[in-house]
Amino acid sequence: MGLQALTIEAIAARAGVGKQTIYRWWASKTDVLLDAFVDDALSGIDPQDSGNLEKDLRRHLTNLSKFLTQSDAGAVFKALIGQAQNDPQLAEKIRVRFTASQRQADCLPIVKAIERGDLPRKTDVDAIVDSLVGPIYYRVLVSGAPLTPAFIKSIVEHFLASIKT
Amino acid sequence: MGLQALTIEAIAARAGVGKQTIYRWWASKTDVLLDAFVDDALSGIDPQDSGNLEKDLRRHLTNLSKFLTQSDAGAVFKALIGQAQNDPQLAEKIRVRFTASQRQADCLPIVKAIERGDLPRKTDVDAIVDSLVGPIYYRVLVSGAPLTPAFIKSIVEHFLASIKT
Amino acid sequence: MGLQALTIEAIAARAGVGKQTIYRWWASKTDVLLDAFVDDALSGIDPQDSGNLEKDLRRHLTNLSKFLTQSDAGAVFKALIGQAQNDPQLAEKIRVRFTASQRQADCLPIVKAIERGDLPRKTDVDAIVDSLVGPIYYRVLVSGAPLTPAFIKSIVEHFLASIKT
Amino acid sequence: MGLQALTIEAIAARAGVGKQTIYRWWASKTDVLLDAFVDDALSGIDPQDSGNLEKDLRRHLTNLSKFLTQSDAGAVFKALIGQAQNDPQLAEKIRVRFTASQRQADCLPIVKAIERGDLPRKTDVDAIVDSLVGPIYYRVLVSGAPLTPAFIKSIVEHFLASIKT
DNA sequence: CGATAATCGAGACGGTACGTCGTGTCTTATC
DNA sequence: GATAAGACACGACGTACCGTCTCGATTATCG
């Protein structure tokens, strides 16, 4: 069931390789996955910027939703994040290798909006981005509720409304 | 490292019990944990209501943060949620046994505010609650960023600002 | 495989009886078998005596052969004797409950012949009987060689020849 | 109590070896014993031949008695033969690996005597050897009666007397 | 004839050993 | 000289039975 169904012996056998060769290059099963996952996952991150904050946010959150729920990489990500709950070292590795880059993309629409002057200079980017992507991750990892366009729309609208004041 | 360091044999030995007795009553290691966890976790949920939405939200989110980061039950919850990423059946069990109740408590401040007339009848409770608790879970499960009072304050203020319009 | 495939739980279940009821009356699995076996095994022993030593011996050894190789009781006997190699107490019980009676029957032709005066008074009955039945048991328990009429004839003839001198 | 007191786990532990290593090389507990037993048991078989049939037979039967009742290998042999009563495959293995060689030694005095001309060419070696060793095995495996020099002497004398005619 | 035991089936219990699987390390034989 | 193949010590798995121990339900005995 999940990661423990994926044995090192099976990986080696499937690769037509001795176990030792695996151990020579990776310290653990999760490291193998992390390496295999990071490359194609990072390539899927979109650095687009249309100049329209609402549009950018909706597109970005939609892409994030699709990554998490529909892509193979997203499935691996969930598996790794799951494993990381029991393994702080893995958690750190995921952050360094993947989450940091993903985070930059998450921040991009906000940062660009600040540069444009659409948002005030003193905006707390971190808190805002967490408020935008947090609900997405929550539904994926915890509640299992579906990520509908309406939900994404609601997140973005609440955010935009909150900064109108 | 986490759940696989907790063997059934150790559980049985520690309980002064034969392995078979564990297997007789629980189908898996996670079921044992789920049973042991649910009782004391649910008891920690607070149904308080002061009549002040902002105050209630901050208190509730603060309690949630403490549960997730500082309590034993929270640690078990993280481990279970982690395992659930590889195991849809476990995910479902967690929702039925625990998340559902937790969710009710999460919704309470909003529901009460609606009853009071502080929020409009047509408020989408689910989307709003996800937006409030989502960022908390995100930091705990994914980013590892700290749950400061300032962060909680920021979440609540953005929400309140968004509904002022 | 043999006796350890016959579990107490299976015996109890097959008899529609609680395990405790078995344990109340028998101390061990072999005791159950011993009881079940002794009755019908003893009833098969023939105390006939025709007055003709050769004829009696051949008939007796033939019967013994059939008992050991063709009857259900013989199969149980082999199983019990097998178990007894590892269990002196069982060995003793088998002797008291069964082998002793069997032995009397084995001795009968010789004893009768002595009474008749066909054999000298000082005949060592035990040694002679062992020499007669020993080869039979040897083939059954050890060598697996078949118990042909010719073999039985050979045993008897050698014995009769040996006492002619 | 015998073989079931000798667990695979104990064998492995005593050998400072993982259980798997045992299972890799032997299919069952009895196979382990058989291998361990055969080597030193075969080495104890004596191919001596003095040219005197009576002397050779007495010496051989005496050695056989000592092997069965006084040596460690004899104890293992009895345990294996016991187990073999419930396990035809084991019975066959014992015959191939051990009994066959033992049998050759058992036959030797008779065969040599025939070569010497002390016994007729048409002698039925198998039947005779069974008659000689059968009583020994019978006392060991079934009756438990002691193997005295007098008993062995009686066996040999009866045999020699029977061929005098 | 109804209360009171004794006996029984059922099966949970603390244990022990089973045979299997996967781990990470070490060795061999091949290319 | 690197590598596939796989043996090795180890430890947890989930299963099967062991012999002991409660449980009701069902009999049988006696008041």
PLM regions with names:
Chain A
Residues 25-27, 94, 98, 133, ...:
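Tryptophan-centric aromatic hotspots in well-structured domains and transmembrane helices
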Residues 1-31, 35:
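Helix-turn-helix
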Residues 31, 36-37, 69-93:
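Amphipathic alpha-helical segments used for helix-helix packing
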Residues 37-43:
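Short, basic, alpha-helical segments at the C-terminal edge of helix-turn-helix-like DNA-binding modules
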Residues 55, 71, 75, 88-115:
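Amphipathic alpha-helical packing segments from all-alpha helical-bundle domains
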Residues 45-77:
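Hydrophobic alpha-helical connector segments
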Residues 59, 100, 108-115, 131, ...:
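C-terminal peripheral helix-coil segments that are non-catalytic and often amphipathic
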